[in-house]
């Protein structure tokens, strides 16, 4: 049975690679890469190449409205472009997609054991004879099939295939998110928080994951004393802040002391300066309102993005894994420049919570 499951995984990986290759080397490649559903000013590969080109000829990529990712990622793209041919670069994106699917699958296998323990503790507080409770619990025999389903969804869903074909840099973002979850689930505190600070450096909206990651780490340590729990969370916050400050310092060194990237990467995104149409609502709203009200509504919309994490954390603190899932849903809905690559992050994790599909209003 195990060998059959592995054979299916190999088959879906092969099929996913073939789908991506058939589209990448077809006449539809350029059309897909230009679609606003797939590429945004913050993840389009054409902008990454332009940024690297400007850097190589001695022009600051952050002077104009060209490149809007952090200097660390800019130099990573430069490294890839310099050592690989164009067709070889594409297979780096394909490999990143495969790794993301496998890592998310591993995360679900590991987390399911903890979720079973959480459910068992919660059952002690309720009537264990209630037959409705058993219907909403994870069945241990379903964890392997759920993990396999995640691989199928991620590798075969158009929301993952199209960004890979377009070589959207969000492919690397999704891989980092998966690695953060894996490191936190395996209780690698320093690694998970460093990776979170790295991804926050590039897209600060993913700082929303900080509460759930801290709670996952605290949950894994199983501190029963409230004082030790508090100190564990504070220590995690300290590691994250120090890592983020260090990465910002390294970025400044890469830019030879210039702070122009702060305006291009963070202020540009916060003020929603590019009103290119996308699948979000920010661009439409801010293209219609009077400039007199623009600053007010920018703050309202941005606060609206972050405010939900407070009640969600308070309500779901006992189940940080579900909190992380809901956080990804919130992130994909309310961020200013969403693409389909944001949607696949939580869609591929739906099988993990398939035991809740029976819930009815």
Q: What are the roles of these predicted feature ranges?
A:
Residues 354-361:
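Aromatic-enriched
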Residues 2-179, 190, 214-330, 339:
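Primarily membrane-embedded glycan-assembly and transfer machineries that use lipid-linked glycans
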Residues 172-176, 192-195, 208, 345:
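Hydrophobic alpha-helical membrane segments of integral membrane proteins
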Residues 192-196, 205-219:
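Transmembrane-embedded, aromatic-rich helix segments that form part
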Residues 347-349, 361:
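Alpha-helical transmembrane segments of secretory-pathway, organelle, and plasma-membrane proteins
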Residues 182-197:
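Extended, structured, electrostatic nucleic-acid-contact surfaces
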